[in-house]
Regions:
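An amphipathic, basic-hydrophobic alpha-helix
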Residues: 65-95, 105, 113
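Active-site-proximal region of nucleotide-activated glycan assembly enzymes
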Residues: 34, 42, 112-165
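Catalytic machinery of carbohydrate-active enzymes
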Residues: 30, 85, 141
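Conserved nucleotide-sugar phosphate-binding/catalytic loop shared by glycosyltransferases and other
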Residues: 4-12, 29-79, 157, 162-165
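An aromatic- and histidine-rich active-site surface loop
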Residues: 42-46, 95-114
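Short amphipathic alpha-helix
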Residues: 17-29
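Short, glycine-rich nucleotide/cofactor-binding loops
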Residues: 9-17, 98
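Conserved acidic residues
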Residues: 5, 93-94, 139
Length: 165
């Protein structure tokens, strides 16, 4: 029997981000590990979460609406990062896995701040905004396809083709 590990998953509020996170969570839980998921209210309303999945809503701040929107988003991201740091310290995950979308950003920033290993997973053929922003700041990048548009060449050594869960 392997030791129980803790995993923190973070995903945006759409099915494209949440369903792969749910799939990984289900597999990790089936293997006896403890898993927590961070998202926004929208994401946690998407059906399909494993019953044993611990969930947390953190502010993330979607960037839109001109300068005022940018400031509001930055403040929300900052607050979400602080809350995610507390969660990481309490939950003590072996790794933080981000699945893209704005709600994954605070947890990935918190992982970096706490020196917790982090991975992003890109489900699409185009690297999304949050994953593009975090690509140079994470330990590994899991991708679903051989060729990913907007993938930073400087991050090629972090890239691992795994497909979609």
């Amino acid at each position: 029997m392997t030791a129980t590990r803790h995993y923190l998953l973070a995903a945006g509020g759409t099915g494209g981000h949440m369903l792969p996170a749910y799939a990984l969570a289900g597999e990790l839980i089936a293997r006896g590990h403890r898993v927590a998921l961070v998202s926004d209210d929208r994401g946690l309303r998407i059906p399909g979460a494993p019953a044993e999945l611990e969930t947390h809503v953190l502010p993330a701040g979607r960037v839109h609406g001109g300068p005022v929107g940018w400031v509001k988003a930055a403040l929300a991201i900052r607050k979400g990062r602080a809350m995610a740091i507390d969660l990481i310290r309490d939950f003590d995950p072996a790794v933080v896995v981000g699945f893209g979308g704005y709600p994954s950003l605070p947890s990935l920033l918190a992982a970096r701040a706490t020196k917790t290993p982090s991975v992003i997973h890109e489900q699409n053929a185009v690297l999304g905004r949050t994953n593009r922003l975090m690509a140079g700041r994470v330990d590994a990048i899991a991708v679903a396809y051989h060729h990913i548009r907007r993938f930073p060449p400087a991050c090629a050594d972090k890239r691992h083709l795994i497909g979609n869960p």
